[in-house]
């Protein structure tokens, strides 16, 4: 390889080591101050230090920023970020692209860097999933049935029966109980959902969701603004939003909701005084909203087919399971019908 070509390759390696290190630092800062998983923060720090060890004086000496034609190039999207989670995801993409460039060009002059970049790239894929809740969001997208609890003396037992037959998602909804009592229930539900491999969400209370180690929180229209909740919870955990009209659904997506509650479809004592939105809103969300949506409100065996016919792939229920004579069998029936498609 000619000397001029080698200098170009060294400049490419220098630029992309800078790019990767800067991207890692952006992610690391959010994990540090935004409450991300401790293991992800440690992984970021280790990766940044490893990148630094390969950023030698030889590579730095090849730098020629004044004559780099790429420094003045900009794209309109580069000046726009919708949320901290968006910042984190953009920078993960930047890291992955830089590592791929390092992997390819380092083969020409520094094979050990090429091998390391390949290993790092696959580690970053896993790190992104862990740090941004990709694993949680994948499981959320696969969920078809969502149990929202109501106060009951045998609440834990009912939920366990439902989990035993495959219920993938549970929300603790306790509107009246004192915070300490709710936390006690939440800790017990967190334990049983972990044992059964199910997602666990807490209604309304970001503080209690964090205190019990839940997978996320569900917010109503009058609860803490979603952006504030995200700032407290970090990018990994799930945030759901109740919606009752197309404008609310669009706003929830714009605010970064991971999933939507779509309802109430039918009249329900859980939402006393609220006019049902009907099946048309279910149809609208299925056709127009690019987020998982759970139809909710008065759904039971008698009307499930109509809800599915309106386009619902996912439903949330309260009384249909909480008040069932056999919660396990009822849950199994819903799962079988929903998974049939």
Swiss-Prot record:
Binds 1 Mg(2+) ion per subunit. Residues 124-341 are annotated as: Thiamine-phosphate synthase. It catalyses: 2-[(2R,5Z)-2-carboxy-4-methylthiazol-5(2H)-ylidene]ethyl phosphate + 4-amino-2-methyl-5-(diphosphooxymethyl)pyrimidine + 2 H(+) = thiamine phosphate + CO2 + diphosphate; 2-(2-carboxy-4-methylthiazol-5-yl)ethyl phosphate + 4-amino-2-methyl-5-(diphosphooxymethyl)pyrimidine + 2 H(+) = thiamine phosphate + CO2 + diphosphate; 4-methyl-5-(2-phosphooxyethyl)-thiazole + 4-amino-2-methyl-5-(diphosphooxymethyl)pyrimidine + H(+) = thiamine phosphate + diphosphate. Residues 1-123 are annotated as: Unknown. One of its GO terms (cellular component) is cytoplasm. Residues 61-80 are annotated as: Disordered. InterPro entries: Aldolase_TIM, ThiamineP_synth_sf, ThiamineP_synth_TenI, ThiD2, TMP_synthase, TMP_synthase_cyanobac_bac. SUPFAM superfamilies: Thiamin phosphate synthase. Its cofactor is Mg(2+). 4-amino-2-methyl-5-(diphosphooxymethyl)pyrimidine binds at residues 171-175, 203, 242, 271. Its EC number is 2.5.1.3. Pfam families: ThiD2 (PF17792), TMP-TENI (PF02581). Mg(2+) binds at residues 204, 223. Keywords: Magnesium, Metal-binding, Thiamine biosynthesis, Transferase. One of its GO terms (biological process) is thiamine biosynthetic process. One of its GO terms (molecular function) is magnesium ion binding. Pathway: Cofactor biosynthesis; thiamine diphosphate biosynthesis; thiamine phosphate from 4-amino-2-methyl-5-diphosphomethylpyrimidine and 4-methyl-5-(2-phosphoethyl)-thiazole: step 1/1. HAMAP family: TMP_synthase, TMP_synthase_cyanobact. Belongs to the thiamine-phosphate synthase family. NCBIfam families: PRK02615.1, thiE. This is Thiamine-phosphate synthase. It comes from Gloeobacter violaceus (strain ATCC 29082 / PCC 7421).
């Amino acid at each position: 390889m000619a000397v001029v070509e080698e200098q170009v390759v060294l400049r490419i390696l220098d630029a992309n080591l800078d790019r990767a290190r800067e991207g890692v630092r952006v992610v690391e800062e959010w994990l540090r101050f935004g409450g991300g998983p401790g293991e992800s923060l440690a992984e970021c720090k280790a990766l940044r230090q490893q990148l630094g060890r390969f950023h030698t004086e030889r590579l730095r000496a090849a730098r020629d920023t004044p004559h780099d034609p790429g420094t003045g190039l900009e794209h309109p999207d580069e000046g726009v970020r919708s949320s901290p989670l968006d910042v984190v995801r953009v920078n993960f993409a930047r890291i992955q692209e830089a590592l791929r460039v390092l992997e390819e060009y380092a083969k020409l002059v520094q094979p050990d860097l090429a091998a390391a970049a390949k290993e790092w790239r696959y580690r970053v894929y896993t790190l992104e999933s862990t740090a941004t809740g990709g694993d949680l969001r994948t499981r959320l997208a696969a969920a078809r049935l969502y149990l929202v609890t109501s106060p009951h003396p045998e609440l834990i037992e009912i939920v366990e029966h439902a989990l035993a037959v495959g219920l993938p998602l549970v929300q603790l909804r306790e509107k009246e109980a004192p915070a300490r009592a709710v936390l006690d229930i939440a800790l017990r539900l967190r334990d049983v959902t972990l044992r059964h491999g199910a997602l666990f969400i807490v209604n309304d209370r970001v503080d209690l969701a964090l205190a019990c180690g839940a997978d996320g929180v569900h917010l109503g229209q009058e609860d803490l603004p979603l952006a504030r909740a995200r700032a407290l919870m970090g990018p990994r955990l799930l945030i759901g939003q109740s919606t009752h009209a197309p404008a609310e659904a669009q706003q929830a997506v714009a605010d970064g909701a991971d999933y939507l509650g779509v309802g109430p479809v039918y009249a329900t004592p859980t939402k006393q005084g609220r006019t049902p939105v009907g099946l048309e809103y279910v149809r609208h969300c299925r056709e127009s909203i690019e987020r998982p949506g759970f139809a909710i409100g008065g759904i039971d065996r008698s009307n499930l087919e109509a809800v599915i016919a309106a386009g619902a792939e996912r439903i949330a229920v309260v009384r249909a399971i909480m008040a069932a004579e056999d919660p396990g069998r009822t849950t199994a029936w819903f799962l079988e019908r929903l998974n049939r498609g």
